């Protein structure tokens, strides 16, 4: 009975959906109890990167040999164990900067500027704006409608999600603004929707042909700063700054194919525009845009979005944030720094 719901089409028409839904979906409580239902099959989330004690430091251009204020503009950050990743969107100098923080201080390890995709040399196709790591793979989103994937040990290119041309075909995203991984899936916040890719489909030799598993409904299209973060139980929080909202998605509601899964019934609304969000354990943080020169950093209730504590303090324009190791990482776009706050 279940096979009528979804099948992975091996005889793919170019750039059409690999995962296609049946016209007649069978909801069967008996089978749901056996296989978990028609949603994503829950798998273990990589939590190894969350191990370690809290950190406290401020990273600046001075921590990168040879860099200048023109060549280093931190945009996004991700901490995995003792390794810190910073996406740099300085015009003409796009890169992923890698640092070691095992001593508690910041030591520059590598600048990822270009790589080989087979016999072709490549660079980031657009402004790098999101980064995460899961099960030995580094994912970096950029506005060029690609999410490049690298080996976390060798830094070699593995593949890319997206074709480099925006769209909603079977392999495409509409730009790409942020990424996270949870329960066996990669979640990309693009210009329109939340896009889902199975981690098992992210394999070498699949560049520009990693199949899109599913997409959400349209969250209203606009350029800007966006984020997606996963709660410990797998619930997804997705910003929509043009609507002053944070949408919640239950992974159990995600279905294969292009049917457009909807947000959870509860959404968090704000007077200001939410840009980025991050969980540190069960605590939720958000940056809220005030105007072109100022933003705020709040801890909020994951249930209703109410302010619990204002962390803006001496920061001027906190934008993209991330959390790991009982530490909140904050990119201040005004001072071009990354601040680690131990919690």
What are these regions (language model features)?
Residues 1-48:
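N-terminal secretory leader/proregion of peptide precursors and effectors
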Residues 44-69, 108-123, 158-171, 208-221, ...:
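Surface-exposed loop and turn segments in beta-propeller and other repeat-based domains
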Residues 68-80, 115-133, 165-181, 219-232, ...:
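Beta-rich, blade/repeat-based domains predominating
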Residues 83, 137, 185, 235, ...:
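Conserved core beta-strand positions within WD40 beta-propeller blades
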Residues 86-92, 140-145, 188-192, 238-243, ...:
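Conserved beta-strand positions in repeat-built beta-propeller and related beta-rich domains
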Residues 93-97, 146-149, 194-198, 244-250, ...:
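Structural motif
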Residues 100-105, 151-155, 199-204, 250-255, ...:
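Short loop/turn segments that connect beta-strands within beta-propeller blades
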Residues 317-343:
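Blade-level signature of beta-propeller repeat domains, shared across WD40, Kelch, NHL, RCC1
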């Amino acid at each position: 009975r279940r096979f009528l719901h979804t099948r992975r089409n091996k005889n793919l028409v170019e750039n059409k959906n690999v995962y296609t839904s049946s016209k007649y979906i069978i909801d069967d409580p008996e089978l749901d109890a056996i296989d978990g239902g028609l949603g994503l099959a829950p798998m273990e989330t990589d939590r190894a990167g969350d191990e370690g004690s809290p950190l406290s430091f401020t990273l600046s251009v001075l921590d990168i040999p040879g860099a200048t204020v023109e060549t280093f503009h931190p945009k996004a950050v991700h901490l995995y164990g003792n390794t810190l990743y910073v996406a740099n969107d300085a015009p003409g100098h796009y890169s992923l900067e890698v640092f070691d923080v095992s001593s508690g201080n910041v030591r520059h390890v590598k600048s990822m500027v270009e790589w080989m995709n087979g016999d072709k040399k490549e660079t980031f196709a657009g402004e790098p704006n999101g980064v995460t790591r899961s099960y030995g793979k580094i994912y970096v989103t950029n506005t060029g409608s690609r999410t490049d994937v690298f080996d976390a040990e060798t830094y070699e290119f593995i593949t890319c999600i997206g074709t480099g041309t925006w769209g909603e075909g079977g392999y495409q995203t509409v730009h790409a603004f942020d990424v996270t991984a949870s329960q066996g899936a990669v979640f990309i916040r693009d210009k329109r929707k939340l896009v889902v890719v199975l981690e098992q489909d992210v394999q070498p030799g699949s560049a520009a042909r990693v199949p899109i598993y599913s997409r959400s409904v349209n969250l209203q299209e606009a350029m800007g700063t966006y984020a997606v973060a996963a709660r410990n139980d797998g619930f997804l929080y997705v910003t929509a700054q043009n609507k002053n909202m944070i949408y919640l998605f239950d992974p159990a509601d995600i279905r294969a194919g292009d049917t457009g899964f909807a947000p959870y019934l509860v959404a968090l609304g704000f007077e200001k525009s939410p840009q980025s969000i991050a969980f540190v354990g069960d605590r939720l943080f958000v940056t809220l845009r005030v105007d072109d020169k100022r933003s705020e950093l709040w801890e909020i209730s994951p249930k209703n979005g109410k302010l619990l504590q204002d962390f803006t303090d001496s920061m001027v324009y906190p934008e993209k944030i991330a959390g790991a190791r009982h530490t909140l990482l904050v990119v201040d776009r005004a001072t071009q720094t990354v601040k680690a706050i131990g919690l």
